[in-house]
Amino acid sequence: MASLSDRLDRVLGATAADALDEQFGMRTVDDLLRHYPRSYVEGAARVGIGDARPEAGEHITIVDVITDTYSFPMKKKPNRKCLRITVGGGRNKVTATFFNADYIMRDLTKHTKVMLSGEVGYYKGAMQLTHPAFLILDSPDGKNHGTRSLKSIADASKAISGELVVEEFERRFFPIYPASTKVQSWDIFKCVRQVLDVLDRVDDPLPAELRAKHGLIPEDEALRAIHLAESQSLRERARERLTFDEAVGLQWALVARRHGELSESGPSAAWKSNGLAAELLRRLPFELTAGQREVLDVLSDGLAANRPLNRLLQGEVGSGKTIVAVLAMLQMVDAGYQCALLAPTEVLAAQHLRSIRDVLGPLAMGGQLGGAENATRVALLTGSMTAGQKKQVRAEIASGQVGIVIGTHALLQEAVDFHNLGMVVVDEQHRFGVEQRDQLRAKAPAGITPHLLVMTATPIPRTVALTVYGDLETSTLRELPLGRQPIATNVIFVKDKPAWLDRAWRRIIEEAAAGRQAYVVAPRIDESDDTDVQGGVRPSATAEGLFSRLRSAELAELRLALMHGRLSADDKDAAMAAFRAGEVDVLVCTTVIEVGVDVPNATVMLVMDADRFGISQLHQLRGRIGRGEHPSVCLLASWVPPDTPAGQRLRAVAGTMDGFALADLDLKERKEGDVLGRNQSGKAITLRLLSLAEHEEYIVAARDFCIEAYKNPTDPALALMAARFTSTDRIEYLDKS
């Protein structure tokens, strides 16, 4: 007998287990049984002459005679052969290709009747199967020959003719699994049946009252029904239970991480009424909003505790997150600690340095003429600095002269040593992973875990906050400071109203004549950046192409500058400095300006091919304007028809400035895998059944259960549920994205 935690090689043997591990990363019985079917076939119906052509990706079964065969060497292994066979003829002619085919060429010969089963594809209108499962029918020796999985079913049927074998397949119910050319759906089904035949009854890790509350069937019944139940209603109930399991596994992983951090010692730093933080509050030329004061109080209390703070601060573009973070960092500096602010780009890091020095004034001039008596110093460390500059900044960090250091990934290098690191602030968290923020926290003194504040201007739906950022407490700033100007957003459907695009260029000229500035944003840098070009789809605008055209055509009378991610750091700094100083009227750019760029005089943004951007991305871009004293306008130009899904998305962005509402819409539009990102090895982190957009009730209930259950963790089955979210040699932590 077997349990869920048993290794597959003990149950299936080394050959099958190794194949499942290599193709899908399955190592335990639990791994295999949670590889759920993606569809079901009520009898393996044959594709015949009168049938409608199946869709690409559909699982089909074909019974026909081989009319042609062709063998050829494999490209990477010339000593091995590939075999291509053709079955049937006319409209439903199908070709099937087999790799490493030396061992099957004697079976798959011309005029042989064969059953093929696999996913159909198309090439130039012709149906194709790639390494399908096969079974030879009516072989001369009377024995069944073919793929092991189909052969075992045929042997078990004890049919005495090929037609009776086919009838057996047509009678039976089969699940269809996500598969590969090396391990096909039939192979997986055979392994699943073999495992379920010897699986001990699975004890349920969820209490009966929780199952009853949500109408969930027992774990043992669900794991068997999802694979074997012929009743659709029972399979649906199994999916509901296993979806809840996934929510529990995910939350257990996050709660475990959170508890691990809470057991560590944090640097206690109480608020000082005579410190730098209090002095900055007195000097600010504006009043904090009620929301900012509330968040600052929460942060201040957390920093004063002897446990590390782990908090996510999210807020609308321009809601004032940075000043709250600066006040929190100064509270740590007042207690003798250093703070590190990690930014995803050099442009954003330089912007933070400038704005923090500006707001601190003499409070950031420690050791300098004109500096306040208890002033600190603020430094910048980026990869593009010269070796001498980096060496000097590293020395100042190591000596403790610098209280706040702002940097990019350069802060993570081994050469960077802190004198007394007490707090890490990560801006735009979605650009970093858990490993990177932990790498920076590890630079603190032995026995101390620095406080962590993660900031994002990308509003996060509740279900994402409970999953991707589930190991962090959450604070939200919704209120915008007084003085923020309204931003009118309009969609230009160029095919319908080409004159509107001409009017957009004139609007930019008018704003420049009034002394104001504009952004023109493109989705690509140049023609070599073809990530969004598809057959039959109009290529999108490029920053370099627009820059070249506009300065000699529509905007020839204005001063233009170009900025994108492939420019050198010096060129980017020069373009940004000229734009900030008012020496440039229009900045033609890519999304390199998506976060952190603050030019109050910019009042117009024209986004070309806006349908190529995500909903949240457009909202972020729009936040670069409306920062000064003048009303602003954002124009979204697109060549898609208004009534398409892409056109409707653009209208949704234009219809609201509520980033949280747009974030919910963005989540519904995207796949969960896109939300969760990829792990460090590049494998997509996806949810199998759980939907962040549809299963909020399950996620909240699972979180509440895990928080309570973790106080006295006794059932190892809960940790097993969480294994694929925590196992460092497979998926890594879920939020390492």
Swiss-Prot record:
Originating organism: Mycobacterium tuberculosis (strain ATCC 25618 / H37Rv)
Other comments on record: Strain H37Ra is estimated to have about 3 RecG molecules per cell.
A single cellular component GO annotation: plasma membrane
Residues covered by region (Wedge domain): 44-171
Function: Plays a critical role in recombination and DNA repair. Helps process Holliday junction (HJ) intermediates to mature products by catalyzing branch migration. Has replication fork regression activity, able to displace proteins bound to DNA. An ATP-dependent helicase with a preference for HJ DNA, followed by lagging strand replication forks (RF). Has DNA helicase activity in both directions in vitro.
UniProt motif DEAH box: location: 397-400
Record note on quaternary structure: Monomer.
Binding-site residues, ATP: 315-322
The enzyme's E.C. designation: 5.6.2.3, 5.6.2.4
Entry note: cofactor: In vitro unwinding requires a divalent metal cation, Mg(2+)=Mn(2+)>Cu(2+)>Fe(2+)>Co(2+).
Swiss-Prot/TrEMBL induction comment: Very slight induction by DNA damaging agents mitomycin C, UV light and methyl methane sulfonate by 24 hours after induction (at protein level).
Outcome recorded upon mutating residue 286 to A: Wild-type HJ DNA-binding, severely reduced ATPase and DNA unwinding activity, reduced ATP-binding
Name of the protein in question: ATP-dependent DNA helicase RecG
Domain of life assignment: Bacteria
GO terms assigned for molecular function: ATP binding; ATP hydrolysis activity; DNA binding; DNA helicase activity
Pfam families from the UniProt entry: DEAD (PF00270), Helicase_C (PF00271), RecG_wedge (PF17191)
Biological classification of the source: Bacteria, Bacillati, Actinomycetota, Actinomycetes, Mycobacteriales
Gene, per the UniProt record: recG
Effect of residue 408 to A: Wild-type HJ DNA-binding, 1.5-fold reduced ATPase activity, 4.5-fold reduced DNA unwinding activity, wild-type ATP-binding
Domains as described in the record: The wedge domain within the N-terminus inserts into the replication fork junction, where the lagging and leading strand split.
